[in-house]
Amino acid sequence: MKTFHGPTCGTAVSLCLLLFLTSALEEGEITSKVKFPPSSSPSFPRLVMVGTLPDLQEITLCYWFKVNRLKGTLHMFSYATAKKDNELLTLIDEQGDFLFNVHGAPQLKVQCPNKIHIGKWHHVCHTWSSWEGEATIAVDGFHCKGNATGIAVGRTLSQGGLVVLGQDQDSVGGKFDATQSLEGELSELNLWNTVLNHEQIKYLSKCAHPSERHIYGNIIQWDKTQFKAYDGVVLSPNEICA
């Protein structure tokens, strides 16, 4: 398999080449993955989405991930606005538990039946609905203990913010912390403006061939949405579950 190294940009570079995730794909490849090397100031490997999110009152956020360590907190997805740096945040702590923060409300922390193994691909889906504040996390197709209601009831995730993968934003696009970063890989990240049902989430967690995939994010679609890469992020072809 030929590895494609995606464009990277140092922190001093003001304009970065657009990173198209589809550019890593070759005929016969299943998908593309993004590798995040270790962070150490002033280098904070990350992907930054081009554009912003719309107002959202329901979401499903799913992705495949592989971690190289379980030390500190591993921040996967960060959406920050001028008013709230934790408008939407997903992470894993040192115990391998999953945390989910919506609209700056108290974090949902859950224990999942499938433990996280270093160097192994896992699939996770986060859902939230404003109507009753129901928030859930499912790992490898199984819902976790501790899913809750009453999370950010009646709230709206606001448009105009910035999506960053692999780092935690303590201000829009900045104030990163090397102990709050992802050291590992991400693939097949999709975001919907609705709550997917259990059957759909179970389906997404399976190792399906591209011809069998029919569920793609309508807000973020892994093979369509444009990102900018910074500080040594590497893009390459990937076969999920290989």
From Swiss-Prot:
Cofactor(s), by name: Ca(2+)
Family annotation (InterPro entries): ConA-like_dom_sf, Neuronal_Pentraxin_Related, Pentaxin_CS, Pentraxin-related
Gene3D superfamilies associated with the record: 2.60.120.200
Subcellular location: Secreted
Domain of life of the source: Eukaryota
Record's keyword annotation contains Secreted: yes
Residues covered by the Pentraxin (PTX) domain: 30-241
Coiled-coil positions: none
PROSITE patterns linked: PTX_1, PTX_2
Signal sequence, renumbered to the chain: 1-24
Binding positions for Ca(2+) 2 per the UniProt entry: 170, 180
Annotated cofactor note: Binds 2 calcium ions per subunit.
Disulfide bonds: 62-125, 112-144, 207-241
Positions of glycan attachment: 147
Keywords: Calcium, Disulfide bond, Glycoprotein, Metal-binding, Secreted, Signal
Role summary: Might serve the role of immunoglobulins.
Family label: Belongs to the pentraxin family.
Protein name: C-reactive protein 1.1
Species whose genome carries this gene: Limulus polyphemus (Atlantic horseshoe crab)
